[in-house]
Structures are given as structure tokens and as C-alpha cells.
Amino acid sequence: MTKSGTTVPCSPHRAERENKMGGWAIAVHGGAGVDPNLPPQRQEEAKQLLTRCLNLGISALRSNASAIDVVELVVRELETDPLFNSGRGSALTEKGTVEMEASIMDGPNRRCGAVSGLTTVKNPISLARLVMDKSPHSYLAFSGAEEFARQQGVEVVENEYFITPDNVGMLKLAKEANTILFDYRIPTAVYDTCGAGVESPLQMNGLPISVYAPETVGCVVVDSEGRCAAATSTGGLMNKMSGRIGDSPLIGAGTYACEVCGVSCTGEGEAIIRGTLAREVAAVMEYKGLGLQQAVDFVVKHRLDEGKAGLIAVSNSGEVAYGFNCNGMFRACASQDGFMEVGIWE
């Protein structure tokens, strides 16, 4: 993996996670850029949620579920839990409302669906799936997406359902600091973009605000047939302008899957968009002949400029990989040959 903008050796158990017999593999993330002072209890809560979602995906894969069904299933679970910044628990706009976005992509035929500006849809990732399966389009946003949701009969709730007391407090702090909380995390005025910097003077409940700092979620899967899929969901930036769209719903930027691999990204959205980060992993595999972990390391090092981000990926041969150039990334991964890892730091 990569860290702090430089390439460091990958641990052997993770650098080449290829199942020689093929088979399924899965990775889940809950965001890159973690406060090094994150209290142990918050770390454990995140690991428990990631483990639960990973096991949910593993169970489905063992039951021969398809990759596209598994990524939707896992991300729905992440959206339902308020710990991370997607679905319930999403970051708030400058108006104090929630505008969510998500995307999903099925690798074998490169079908995709994406949504933005959702305010009432309980599970944005499932609406993105319906855009892919039930509409002639790839991307619907704001009132058009909401209308489509009602036509399809998906579960909708009041906007207040998504708002948590922690996020109300964070929005207040962001407004007082006259800034946004970059990727639902740390005021850019007092912290660098991935959690490493001087101690923030802003606190909530006596703790640095970055302890309330999970962000974008995603899942990538290759099933036993070698089919790859990817899904990503987020509430975006705290105190963002209404109408802002990040990388998560943009196919090729925050999410991508093809016959070669599946990728989900997290971090500084504008940098991920400029680097078309998710597609770049597939491109260097296809055109430079790199393996999955090599491709991940390459794009994190060479395609982010000064941006901070991370990503998870799987290949059609059963490899699973991840990389990030900041302090940490909430992640969990497993493969059919018995490998499993749940972690935050390097």
C-alpha cells in the first residue's frame, strides 16, 4: 500500500492476495483519513460494523449470490447504520439538510447506475441499482431521482431520519469556523486534508471533533464466476453547498467495475474526480499489465497530485487490495481461500 505520498512495502499476506484457484473476494471501506487520536472505543465500533458487513457479504457469496447483489446488500447495511457518512448519519449541507449520493457498477457488461441529491430515499444504493436496472439512463439527480424513487416504490422517509445529534453539532462548529469539514471530518482551516496536522482547537462533548469522523462507504466484490462489481455511497461534505456533487456517484472517479476489476474510492472528492481514480486502476491493469496491488499503488502515488484518498479493489482472479496516502482507512477484506483482515491503520 502507499502512505503519506510514498510507496512502502506491502505486507506479504496482502500484497498479492490472489486465490490461485480463483474464487470470490470482497472488500469494504468506511472512509480514508482517520484521526490518529481516534479513541479506542470509536475504533472498535467501526471495526465491529465493518466485520458485520464483511460477514454479511461472505455469507451471501457462499450462497452463490452474484457480485452485483452482494455489493448492494453490503452498502445497504452500511447506509442503515449511522456510524458512517451514508444514509442515516449523512453529513449536513449548509442549510442543515441531507443530500445523499451513490453509484453502483456491474463489471461484466459495464452497466451502471448513479444518483445524487437524494433527500428522502432510505437506501440510495438501491435506487442507484434501480436506475441501472429499470431506467434507460445511468444517472438521475435531485427531483428527478426522487420522482423515480416513488415510481419504483422504494422506501422513503422524512429528511429528519438521516440527521443525527452529532452531525447537528458538527455543522454548528463548521459554521462557527466558517469552513467545511473536509469529507465529513476535520475543518480544513485547522487540519490538513487527511487527518495529520496540528491539534484542532474545535471540540464537541470534550473530544476533538475528528473523533466523529467516519465518511464515505463502499464495497467491491468478485464472485465465484469471476464477475466484479463495485458500489459507493456518501452524504458528502459537512456544511457543503446545496447541490454539490462529489466523486462517489461519478462512474470512473469514485466507482468503477469492468471485466478486469472492481474499485471503490474515498477521500478528497475533487482530487479523485480530477484523477478519474477508479478507472485508472483498471486502465493500468489493462494497458500497463500491472497486477491489482501494483495498480492500486501506482494510481494512489501518481494520480492524486496533492490530494488525499484511499481505495479498495478486487480482480477477476480473486485478488483483493487497498491503498491510501493518508493516516488510515477503515477497511475489511476477505477471500475464498480463508484470508480475512479488518483494520484502520497501516
Where are these regions (language model features)?
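Alpha/propeptide regions of enzymes that mature by internal proteolysis
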Residues: 2-3, 7-346
